[in-house]
Structures are given as C-alpha cells and as structure tokens.
C-alpha cells in the first residue's frame, strides 16, 4: 500500500471514531424531561376526552348531598315526633303556629315511615266507612293529608294542628268547633299523641251522636305491657267509663291495633273518676 493510501485509510478510521453509528439493538436513553413531556401529553389527551389519569373514588356530589339531606331530615323528624308525644295538644299547636314548615317536615318523615308498613291503618278505617252508609258524618281527628276525606263520599270534618288546604281545620283536637252530638263517626288514626290524649277522646264523645262510632287505630307497641306499653284492658275500661261500649278489639295486625267503640244512648248520672293509662310514646331509633 502506498503512502497516500495509508494516509487516506487512517483518515477514514478517525472519522468513524468521531461519528460512531448507534447500534440498532442499543436503546436510546430517555431523560426525565422526556418522561414528563410524555406524561403531560397523556394527561392532556385524557382531559380532552373527558377522562382522568386516576379514577376518582369519591361519591357523586348529588348522591352525597341527597344522603346528607335525608339524614338531616330523619333527625328532625325524630325530634318532632318525640315532641308531639311528650307535650300537650295546646303546646304542639303553638309550636307549629310559630314555624308551620316544621309540620311539613314532620309529615314528610311520617310518610317515609309509613312506606315501610305492609298495611296502613288508615285503609282499614276507609274500608269500614265504605262498607257503611255514605250519609254518616265523620270527624277525623289528626287527619294528616286528609286521606279519609279524599277517599270516601261522606261529609268529613278534618282536624289537625296545621291547615295546608281549605278542607283541613287547624285546631287543638281537645277543643274543636263542632257542635255537640253533631257527627256519626269519630276517627283517631295514629293520632293519640299528646300527653293529654284523654281530652281528645272526651271531645270525640261530646261531638258524637248517641250510638255514634269511635274508631281508633294505634301503634301496637303502645299497648304491649311487657315492653312498657299500656295494658289494652285498662285503656278499653277507661273509654267505656267515659260513656262507650266496646265493639271490636283487633290485634291481628303486626304493626297496629284497632279499637271500635259505640257511644251509649244514655249517660249514667253518677260520674266516675276515670283512670286513664299512660300510653307509651312511639319513638323512632336512629338507623
């Protein structure tokens, strides 16, 4: 090889050493900067498609707020329910006069509780009325949403602590505006709640005609003497001492008990001292 050829060969070797070709099998290093750029590109792509780089485990806001509202509503219902069972009718009337919205809140909670019952006592009373003459005049003490008046053709006087429609008369149920001996049927459907419940029954006796019917539906646990409730025999005796005769005692339902009484034609001249049993308050536990 000539001197020129050797020189040219050495130059080619130096050039290859200065600019080596990368091996096809050798991985090209990725710098942290490149990794961050790729992550940012992925996050941007996810955001553009409504996605997220990590799935959220939090509940949907609407579901959370609904659950919170339901919990607050349930707590307020329990508070109002306890108040109604532990105060007089006059005190309850004054309370709801100051804040009528509390009455709406109570009845919303009440309807939720009733939705868990397999059978509603108001339907038993409605069926009784439908099976009798529509000419009977009815007084519904503690009418709630006035379902009885909406379900029968009878003339119905609907009483409750607050009136939300013209057909309901707001009053203390121990002192209604009805004339004496003016109605044929008096109804108490889960409404003997005040500490002075006996005065409600006395008012029903006043407004009923002779031979008029008194229909009472109450929570069964209130008449369970083994668990702090009243003895139903004592309750029936007190009502009969007031001037009624017992017609029906129905314990067959799991949730409520039915009493039917008839007003006596004539009252005894000797007034008895009536011993009214204390009815157990029906309080709902927090779930």
Swiss-Prot record:
Residues 9-21 have a biased composition (Basic residues). Keywords: Chromatin regulator, Methyltransferase, Nucleus, Repressor, rRNA processing, S-adenosyl-L-methionine, Transcription, Transcription regulation, Transferase. Its EC number is 2.1.1.-. S-adenosyl-L-methionine binds at residues 107, 142, 160, 172-173, 189. SUPFAM superfamilies: S-adenosyl-L-methionine-dependent methyltransferases. Residues 35-46 have a biased composition (Basic and acidic residues). It comes from the Eukaryota. It is an enzyme of class 2 (transferase). Pfam families: Methyltransf_8. Its main location: nucleus. GO terms for biological process: methylation; rDNA heterochromatin formation; rRNA processing. GO terms for molecular function: methylated histone binding; methyltransferase activity. It is found in: Nucleus, Nucleolus. Transmembrane segments: none annotated. Residues 1-62 are annotated as: Disordered. One of its GO terms (cellular component) is rDNA heterochromatin. Probable methyltransferase required to silence rDNA. Belongs to the methyltransferase superfamily. RRP8 family. This is Ribosomal RNA-processing protein 8.
